[in-house]
Amino acid sequence: MVPAEYNSHHIIMKEYLIFLAQSHPAFRKAELESLADLHNIKADFSNHNEEHPFMIVQLENDEEAYQLIDRAILSKSIYELWGHGNTMEELHTDVKKKVDQLKERYIDSSFKFENLTFQGGKKSREQQVAIFDQFRYLEFTGKIKLKNPDQVYTILEQYSLGANLQPLDTPDHIWFGRQVNISARSRGAVEKYDIKKRPYFGTTSFDAELSLFTCNMGQVKKSDLIYDPFVGTGSFLVTAAEFGGITIGSDIDFLTLKGKGPKRRLKSNFDYYKKPLQFTDVLCMDFTNNAFRSNLKFGSILCDPPYGVREGVKVCGSNDPRKEGREKVVIDGQLAFLRRDYIPPKKAYSLDLLLDDLLHFASERLDVGSRLCFWMPVANDEDIPTMIPQHEDFELIYELVQDFHKWSRRLLVYLKRGDDYKGITLTSEDREGVNNFRDRYFHKFSKLSMADKKNSNSSSGSV
């Protein structure tokens, strides 16, 4: 373990303890890395363990610790670490080694103590006070304030569960630290953006927790223009506004954008959260044939492309070749597609082609260093590495898996690189795997879907 403080290039690093959430543990490290990169914080998270709720990191100062956790969704809080041990005796021994240099700045500050446990159940007030009294040797002279104190000192305990799934009598490990900051999660962000609390939501609305997490992975920043090309009911845009993003979206489905009345539409969600100025607009538009000016750039692109399960994958056009080339039809002296009552035809499209279009679009619309984040569904028995779309202008920096037994969805995070970077391009024609997720889904992920059986039968009948 790295010492509590060490001199590296004349910078003294300090130990901090992060209390992690137990939701989506496989995603926690990626979020912390993205937030550290967003704030230009150099930190090593290699000792992260998905099975443990605590992690020690080395940071320069409290400001870095505060920024790292402030908008985190999969972390709870961060503490300047004053000591730790397997028992209370070991903890106090460790704290006493460092206390003189650590407490000097806070000796006169108002304060309170708190006790947090992982899997340990809730202690009675008497039990907590007995633990707090053991730290009398700190000899703080400031006032005790239970509400809004200057400093909060926390004893954190990790317990294991016994055979009856009840916590054991003694903790496995104990930490003591000074609270630096609590996260957006601990301040209630996930509950605040709960889908059912919004005026307008639908069957395709994205989970609040993962929407907020996706915004962090996309490094949404204040005043950045954030775009969702499959906006639906606006889950990503609403949560992007929480982090200061200026939002714009589009969708090919006019009825979704129209909503269910003047008080139950996408804009109503921004009014509900008192962020109307961060909502630019939503456009009824096929993004593969978009109306944006050629030099318009976005800070991030975040989306959940239609899988074809609840909503089919469609773009403007016609599957009937007889109807192609009829764009110049004139009605009453006016081009048909310019009339207010014109409804553009739509045709079915494949998810693979849609993702190719998305990467190409993002390559033209994102500046170097910006991120494209989208969720891609796959059947778990597919050869997944061969199905991931690639573009020469992007580096795939994260592939995060949320498993649903027979299928999974993956958050793919791409970083736009500069001219000196030359990645590979894998379009739907180049990729070996075919993402026929919709067909597999409706046939309950059987080994041979109807389309596969049809191809198999036609092959066996040939000579």
Show where each model-derived region lies.
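Class I S-adenosyl-L-methionine-dependent methyltransferase catalytic core
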Residues: Y6-L68, F118-Q119, N148-D150, T154, ...
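Conserved AdoMet
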Residues: E50-R105
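A short N-terminal interaction module
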Residues: D100-P167, I174
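Charged/polar, solvent-exposed surface patches and flexible loops
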Residues: S34, T93, K97, A130-Y137, ...
